[in-house]
């Protein structure tokens, strides 16, 4: 009921509209800001990086960023399609979020069983099948201000345990990442090209990937705040809070006067986030 919310915003004299980590809320907030004539940090194309995993991978390939191999599999799958699949693979909704409908598959039987869950987790009933890369999961966090792009943090994620056929849960996310030199050489230039290609000007974004010994592949984008709230760690380390900047943008249309050059992902100490 975005129209009713817009009426309430005007009636109550609301100064700004802001949202956090959920994809549904991002879409509604953008619509609400447009109705109320208030600033929102992301365009429809930029938000599509959140919602459409195939679109995100296409943009990565164009920018020279490594991504997992994709497989064409229909519902129900054809024998020829299944014969081309090399396991393990991960099956997930094309346009879902929050880990819903995501399954790791070691063989054809598990792949067939995973498809209905991925379809159910997609608002459009579409799913993707791609290479499951074994390695350390990492997250790259960028902040944008007036077209300036800054790598705010690179985090390594340490899992508690693997649950049956689903992605890992995490006890600890630690920065700086042990893979920072590899990331700076292989991935950072590509992400800057990607963000420039979608005309990223203000806001924050994170990219999730898997670091193997000699390569990093990326599979997910969040053009939004991330659920680990690492702005606390970044502010403690560098004195810059992208959360404060985002709130300021929602109120004024400007990210303020924070100095992004103070950010340095190569911290001289460790900073961690625990999942309790």
Residue ranges and their predicted role:
Residues 131-134, 138, 142-200, 204, ...:
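ATP-dependent carboxylate/phosphate-activation module, predominantly the ATP-grasp catalytic core
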Residues 66-68, 88-90, 102-135, 155, ...:
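Conserved ATP-binding module of the ATP-grasp superfamily
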Residues 89, 150, 217-220:
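Protein kinase-like catalytic core scaffold
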């Amino acid at each position: 009921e975005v129209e009713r919310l817009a009426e309430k915003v005007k009636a109550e004299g609301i100064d700004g509209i802001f949202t956090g980590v959920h994809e549904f809320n991002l879409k509604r907030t953008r619509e609400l800001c447009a109705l109320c004539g208030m600033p929102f940090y992301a365009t429809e194309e930029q938000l599509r990086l959140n919602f459409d995993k195939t679109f995100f991978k296409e943009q990565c390939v164009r920018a020279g960023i490594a991504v997992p191999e994709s497989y064409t599999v229909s519902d129900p799958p054809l024998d020829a399609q299944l014969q081309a699949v090399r396991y393990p693979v991960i099956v997930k909704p094309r346009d879902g979020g929050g880990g819903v409908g995501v399954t790791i598959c070691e063989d054809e039987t598990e792949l067939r069983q995973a498809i209905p869950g991925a379809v159910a987790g997609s608002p459009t009933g579409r799913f993707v099948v791609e290479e499951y890369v074994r390695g350390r999961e990492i997250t790259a966090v960028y902040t944008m201000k007036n077209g300036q792009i800054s790598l705010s943090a690179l985090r390594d994620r340490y899992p508690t345990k693997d649950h049956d056929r689903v992605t890992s849960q995490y006890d600890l996310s630690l920065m700086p990442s042990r893979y920072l030199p590899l990331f700076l050489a292989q991935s950072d230039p590509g992400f800057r090209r990607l963000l420039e290609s979608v005309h990223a000007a203000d806001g924050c974004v994170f990219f999730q990937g898997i670091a193997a010994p000699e390569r990093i592949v990326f599979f997910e984008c969040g053009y939004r705040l991330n659920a680990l709230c690492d702005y606390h760690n970044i502010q403690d380390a560098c004195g810059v809070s992208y959360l404060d900047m985002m709130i300021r943008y929602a109120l004024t249309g400007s990210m303020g006067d924070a100095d992004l050059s103070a950010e340095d992902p190569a911290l001289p100490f460790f900073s961690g986030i625990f999942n309790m």
